[in-house]
């Protein structure tokens, strides 16, 4: 069975399921129009759902269960996989959001996001310190070919020292710019991009059953563990990306220890 993760793709692109024919497709309505949080969906072929078997069950997913007889019957179809009470107060917002996207047109959204993202990338990679060194390092393509609206970077001072992404997130928030810092649910990509080795990280999982994030940072000698992410989407405007570039330009010739 094939699962297509379209959560990041679908909000700004038309997904052609006649060309790609997976068994399952997951979507996030929050990523599409920003509200409501915590609601997504799994599109599934009927024959694929019939092959699924659950090792446990929760409320709302069974037709009958017995403790004495130690048995249960799973609700047929998709309902057998919807644990608990669905968010019936938030679901009407999904219908309104989909109608809003339909009224604009996904192609229009795609073109707009592509233009804003392309301009943002061009401006960020062009930033230079007086000595010619780049202010930011961009992860991923330097153009919009095969790229969505997510722009991930790290900032560097004139001496090439990386400025911690958590500090950058804090400063951006103070400037009323919403950025996210971290590994963004993709630790493997983070480790490759930042050059962490197996030996660097294996020590973090020795000797202790658990470790706080602060203890983790101490174990890797305070190295930056992520990057700074800006997401361009349906609600983004040119004023948004322009404000980010203006903010980024304030780090030209700015030493890391001053941040």
Task: Describe each PLM feature range.
Residues 1-259:
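Pyridoxal 5′-phosphate
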């Amino acid at each position: 069975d094939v699962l297509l993760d379209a959560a990041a793709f679908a909000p700004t692109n038309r997904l052609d399921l006649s060309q790609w024919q997976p068994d399952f497709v997951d979507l996030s309505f929050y990523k599409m129009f920003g509200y409501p949080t915590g609601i997504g969906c799994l599109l599934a072929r009927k024959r694929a759902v019939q092959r699924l078997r659950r090792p446990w069950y929760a409320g709302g997913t069974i037709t009958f269960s017995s403790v004495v007889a130690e048995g249960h019957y799973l609700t047929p179809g998709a309902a057998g996989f919807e644990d608990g009470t669905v968010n019936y107060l938030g679901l009407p917002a999904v219908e309104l959001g989909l109608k809003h996207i339909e009224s604009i047109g996904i192609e229009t959204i795609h073109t707009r996001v592509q233009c804003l993202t392309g301009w943002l990338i061009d401006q960020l990679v062009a930033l230079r310190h007086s000595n010619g060194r780049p202010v930011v390092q961009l992860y991923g393509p330097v153009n919009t070919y095969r790229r969505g609206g997510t722009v991930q970077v790290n900032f560097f001072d004139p001496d090439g020292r990386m400025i911690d992404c958590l500090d950058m997130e804090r400063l951006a928030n103070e400037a009323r710019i919403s950025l996210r810092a971290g590994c963004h649910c993709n630790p493997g990509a983070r480790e490759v991009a930042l050059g962490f080795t197996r030996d660097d990280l294996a020590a973090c999982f020795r000797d202790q059953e658990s470790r706080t994030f602060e203890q983790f940072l101490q174990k890797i000698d305070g190295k930056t563990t992520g990057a700074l992410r800006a997401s361009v989407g349906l609600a983004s405007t040119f004023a948004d990306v322009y404000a980010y570039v203006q903010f980024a330009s304030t780090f030209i010739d700015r030493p890391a220890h001053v941040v």
